[in-house]
């Protein structure tokens, strides 16, 4: 279970807005013009069906599928359908074009998430069609499946993700191999083709199908890696692009894990200080609690037991958003003082995509498939074990888990990965707004700085949000007003601007 952003929050968060000053984002606006090259045919928009486990999004939304090559090296071969959802601009006479969204994961379904998050983007929707999509290998776009609910439940209950004995380590390694074998068995046709580079090519096909001369795009979390890859492949087609909660494009598998150990420890310490607790003492207390749970899982009212992995997941979940910190306080109090795991288990279930009936969504399947298609790294259990002491120094709570995760993720994966780190240089592209939040646990602030540098001088425009949480639009009035002015008026903030 790799730490990620599930992008489930759809509420509007408000803050103080600041006046915007800046230069225009070039002479071109990303208006809907004739496609610049041949591509998919005109989309046939129809009423949307309810997503798995969800409800119909409503009459304002329409859905379609755009067919693209399964293998871009064989453009005349088999195709894969990319699922789209759209809500048209409310001021049609002032329409700028389409705005494509990716909310992260990888593995998040834009078709599912965008209607629930659309309230946060009402101002942008006045002049843009809001468009979400399921990247290849996700949900409605030939979503990857690797195991059933029973197998998923047994793995979360029975596999120790921080193994302490040879037997636990052997089971940990075998579970990773079994998961990959399940993906190959159930989704073998699509599995070699679900990487981020292909998803970026799909985005350009979507742009052409929508009739937009330039791509307007809002990428969050993993969506920033996808956006950086798109800018590298198609710099001439970049319109107005915002990358918020940025994945470090210079980090490899171990580097990402190290970044997250640092980021989540920083967020935990900020949480503890906010609660009037000493960060070092609080960290030691939580680490000791996890050690006890590893040996003796906590009971819950459902009859399920809260093991160390689920407890850690329950702690991780509310650190993504400061507004969820009270839930963490209550859940920790239950676990530490009442000896019950209900609160942490509920948070873990939300993170893991488990509903009250025991059904799991498949975001974690898609996430793993996409990540392992991207990265060539295949660390062994022995290599992960050697990382544990150093990672524990970075974070006594999260470090050991993240060290072991480097091996549990893609070892013995049935498909080779594409690269060590993604390419994001985009010479000649229009200015891209890159937003980093200083207290972001999942994609630490430094990754945004590196993305801005990688995009190149005059392309990456750095905006700092001094705050907590994973993602800043809607949570910071300053950031929100700057992003709105950029998308709606083409005003590019000064590089290095800070929102406090």
Where are these regions (language model features)?
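Secretory targeting and sorting signals
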Residues: 1-30, 66, 203
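Generic alpha-helix initiation/capping and coil-helix boundary signal
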Residues: 4, 8-9, 14, 324, ...
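Feature targets compositionally biased, intrinsically disordered low-complexity regions
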Residues: 4, 14, 21, 25, ...
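Gly/Pro-rich cap/lid or specificity-loop segments adjacent to the active site
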Residues: 29-310, 369-371, 375-500
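Alpha/beta-hydrolase-fold enzymes
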Residues: 276-371
């Amino acid at each position: 279970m790799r730490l990620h952003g599930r992008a489930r929050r759809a509420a509007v968060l408000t803050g103080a807005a600041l006046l915007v000053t800046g230069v225009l984002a070039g002479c071109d606006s990303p208006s809907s013009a004739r496609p610049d090259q041949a591509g998919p045919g005109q989309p046939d928009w129809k009423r949307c069906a309810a997503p798995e486990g969800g409800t119909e999004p409503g009459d304002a939304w329409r859905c379609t599928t755009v067919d693209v090559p399964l293998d871009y090296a064989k453009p005349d071969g088999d195709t894969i359908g990319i699922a789209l959802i759209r809500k048209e601009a409310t001021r049609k006479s002032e329409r700028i074009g389409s705005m494509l969204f990716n909310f992260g994961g990888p593995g998040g379904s834009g078709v599912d998430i965008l209607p629930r998050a659309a309230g946060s983007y009402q101002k942008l929707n006045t002049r843009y069609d809001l468009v979400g999509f399921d990247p290849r290998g996700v949900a409605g776009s030939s979503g990857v499946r690797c195991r059933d609910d029973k197998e998923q439940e047994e793995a979360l209950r029975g596999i120790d993700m921080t193994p302490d004995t040879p037997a636990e380590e052997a089971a940990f390694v075998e579970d990773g191999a079994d998961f990959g074998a399940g993906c190959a068995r159930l989704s073998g046709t699509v599995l070699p083709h679900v990487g981020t580079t292909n998803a970026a090519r799909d985005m350009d096909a979507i742009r052409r199908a929508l009739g937009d001369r330039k791509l307007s795009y809002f990428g969050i979390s993993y969506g920033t890696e996808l956006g950086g890859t798109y800018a590298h492949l198609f710099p001439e087609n970049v319109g107005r692009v915002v990358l918020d909660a940025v994945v470090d494009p210079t980090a490899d598998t171990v580097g990402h894990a190290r970044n997250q150990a640092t980021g989540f420890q920083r967020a935990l310490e900020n949480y503890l200080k906010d609660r009037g607790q000493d960060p070092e003492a609080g960290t030691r207390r939580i680490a000791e609690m996890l050690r006890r749970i590893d040996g003796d899982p906590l009971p819950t009212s459902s009859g399920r037991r809260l093991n160390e992995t689920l407890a850690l997941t329950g702690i991780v979940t509310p650190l993504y958003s400061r507004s969820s910190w009270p839930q963490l306080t209550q859940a920790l109090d239950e676990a530490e003082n009442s000896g019950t795991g209900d609160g942490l288990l509920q948070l873990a279930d939300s993170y893991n995509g488990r509903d009250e009936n025991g059904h799991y969504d498949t975001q974690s399947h898609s996430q793993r498939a996409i990540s392992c298609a991207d990265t060539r790294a295949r660390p062994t259990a022995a290599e992960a074990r050697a990382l544990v002491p150093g990672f524990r120094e970075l974070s006594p709570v999260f470090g050991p888990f993240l060290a072991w995760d480097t091996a549990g993720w893609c070892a013995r994966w049935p498909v080779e990965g594409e690269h060590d780190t993604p390419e994001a240089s985009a010479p000649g592209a229009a200015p891209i707004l890159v937003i980093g939040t200083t207290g972001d646990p999942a994609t630490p602030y430094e990754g945004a700085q590196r993305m801005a540098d990688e995009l190149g001088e005059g392309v990456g425009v750095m905006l700092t949000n001094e705050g907590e949480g994973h993602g800043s639009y809607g949570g910071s009035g300053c950031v929100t007003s700057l992003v709105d002015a950029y998308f709606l008026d083409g005003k590019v903030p000064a590089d290095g601007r800070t929102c406090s």
